[in-house]
C-alpha cells in the first residue's frame, strides 16, 4: 500500500496528521519559505508526543540549495542534533553551482546522519540532469527522493516521476507538490509508492485585537493573522483513497 507523508509545521499539525492516518511526517518551519529547519523546542516536543515516524527537514534558509561554508556547518550540526534526538530520518539536499549534487558535502551529511534514512528533498527538482543526479543519490545511499518531476506540481511532472521510478537502482521516488485527494488516484494508478502532501489550509488567528496598520513581514501585504495548518479531514480522505485503491 502506498505510504502517505504529511508536511507539518508544528507539533499540533503533526498530531493532527498522526490522528488522521498519516504514515510519516516531514517536520518543517516557515511554510512561506518552502520549509526550513524546525527549532530545537519543536523537535523535542514532537519527539516526545508524536509516535509515527517523523523526518525533520534540514534547510538553513529559503532560496537555492548552494550553501556557504557557514550555512553548511549549520546543516551538519542540525543533522547531528536530529540524530541525537532519536529521529529515524531527515530531509535535506545540497547542490553545487552547476546544479549537480554536491557530492563531497552530501557525503559528509550522510556520514553525520549515520543510520538515519535520508530523503533528498526538492533540490532534486532544481538539478541540471535528473537521471545523473538519481545515480549519484543512489551511490550516496539516499533512501528516497521527494520530487515533482521537475515541474511546478507533481501532476504535471508525473511522466518524469514514472521515468525516475523505472530507473535502475533508484531510491524510493516520493511524489510531492500539489498532491491532493482529488488527484491522488493518478499517482496510485501510476505505481507511485510514496506520496507527500501538505493537506493543509489557512486558519484564521484567534487574535481579537489586530493592529492592521503594521506587518512583521517584509511583505507589507502579508496576512499576519492566519497560519497554515494540517486539515485532518483532508489527511483522512487521502488515507481512505489509498486504502480503497489497495483493496481493488
UniProtKB/Swiss-Prot annotation:
- Gene Ontology terms, cellular component aspect? cytoplasm
Superkingdom of origin organism: Bacteria
Q: Which InterPro entries match?
A: CutC-like, CutC-like_dom_sf
Quote the Pfam families the UniProt record gives: CutC
Statement: the UniProt record of this protein carries the keyword Cytoplasm? yes
**Subcellular location as annotated:** Cytoplasm
Task: Name the UniProt key words of this record, in alphabetical order.
Answer: Cytoplasm
Q: Which GO terms describe its molecular function?
A: copper ion binding
Q: Which family does it belong to?
A: Belongs to the CutC family.
* Assembly behavior: Homodimer.
Its protein name is PF03932 family protein CutC
Q: Which organism is it from?
A: Shigella boydii serotype 18 (strain CDC 3083-94 / BS512)
Q: Give the classification, highest ranks.
A: Bacteria, Pseudomonadati, Pseudomonadota, Gammaproteobacteria, Enterobacterales
Amino acid at each position: 500500500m502506498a505510504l502517505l507523508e504529511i508536511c507539518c509545521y508544528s507539533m499540533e499539525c503533526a498530531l493532527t496528521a498522526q490522528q488522521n492516518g498519516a504514515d510519516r511526517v516531514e517536520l518543517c518551519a516557515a511554510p512561506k519559505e518552502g520549509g526550513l529547519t524546525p527549532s530545537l523546542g519543536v523537535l523535542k516536543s514532537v519527539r516526545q508526543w508524536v509516535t509515527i515516524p517523523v523526518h525533520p527537514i534540514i534547510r538553513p534558509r529559503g532560496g537555492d540549495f548552494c550553501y556557504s561554508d557557514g550555512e553548511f556547518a549549520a546543516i551538519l550540526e542540525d543533522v547531528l542534533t536530529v540524530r541525537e534526538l532519536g529521529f529515524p530520518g531527515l530531509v535535506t539536499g545540497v547542490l553545487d553551482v552547476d546544479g549537480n549534487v554536491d557530492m563531497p558535502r552530501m557525503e559528509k551529511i550522510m556520514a553525520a546522519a549515520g543510520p538515519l534514512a535520508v530523503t533528498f528533498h526538492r533540490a532534486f527538482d532544481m538539478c541540471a540532469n535528473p537521471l545523473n543526479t538519481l545515480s549519484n543519490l543512489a551511490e550516496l545511499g539516499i533512501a528516497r527522493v521527494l520530487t515533482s518531476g521537475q515541474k511546478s506540481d507533481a501532476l504535471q511532472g508525473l511522466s518524469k516521476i514514472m521515468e525516475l521510478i523505472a530507473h535502475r537502482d533508484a531510491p524510493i521516488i516520493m511524489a510531492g507538490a500539489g498532491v491532493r485527494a482529488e488527484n491522488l488516484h493518478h499517482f496510485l494508478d501510476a505505481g507511485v509508492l510514496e506520496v507527500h502532501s501538505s493537506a493543509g489550509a489557512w486558519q484564521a488567528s484567534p487574535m481579537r485585537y489586530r493592529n492592521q496598520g503594521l506587518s512583521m513581514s517584509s511583505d507589507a501585504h502579508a496576512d499576519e493573522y492566519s497560519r497554515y495548518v494540517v486539515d485532518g479531514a483532508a489527511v483522512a480522505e487521502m488515507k481512505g483513497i489509498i486504502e480503497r485503491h489497495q483493496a481493488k
